[in-house]
Amino acid sequence: MLVHPNPDPIAFSIGPVDIHWYGLMYVLAFAMFIILGRVRIKQPHIAAQGWKPEDLDDMLFYGMLGVVLGGRLGEVLFYQPGYFFENPLEIFKVWKGGMSFHGGFLGVLIAMALWARKSKRNILDVYDFIAPMVPLGYAAGRLGNFINHELPGRIADPSLPWAMLWPNPNGIGFLDTPRHPSPLYQMLIDGILVFLILWPFARKARPRLAVGAMFTLLYGCARFFTEWFRVPDWETTVMGLPITSGQVLSLPMIVAALVMLAWAYSSRDGRQTLRST
């Protein structure tokens, strides 16, 4: 059995300004977007579409706004509306954590649609381009959740080698029963594993929307699975089976991804895009 290291959420201070680990994970995520993006624009089928390094800088600016605004708004609306209604000023304290991936996902889609319109690019091509860079950034965010000891897991069998004593939310000691380290599960499965599958898939020319749809499908399925190990923000039942808030939000992603994949591989537009790269 393991014990959560329970580090100080403040990594270091510069004068009166505290730099939080959670914020540093977002910096790491944005840096990986640029690094992976520079690798991606050198791939022949991507270079043929005319992507340039300066496009990455523009997309990063739009994407940062989409992630932060959408992620926070999603946390408020999807997960903790009651808490934020009673404590509205807490909405602005993003350094404490509390960012919804599903909200950030929608925020980034809106931001990329705006950038695509500005740059006169097809939004489907933009989604295909950025999708392989998302999972590692997501993994960094989940590591930030772990450092902040957020998203505690469900009670685990003490004999499980990686069962973990989790810090008590009241700040004193640890919870009595070991837990699944759910942020690490989501970092490894929803983030790193999805990246390891998606990146090789995206290295070859695919029909328009195929890469974006594959990311949506992989993440939706991975998130649906890892939600079983996480204490849900809220839970409901579907056909008599308990289902968590994250699973409710992931199901539409899975359905939409299957529709998008079918369109990508059967539509004339998707096949034409593949022939032109």
Regions found by a protein language model. Give the residues of each.
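Hydrophobic, membrane-interfacing alpha helices
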Residues: 1-277
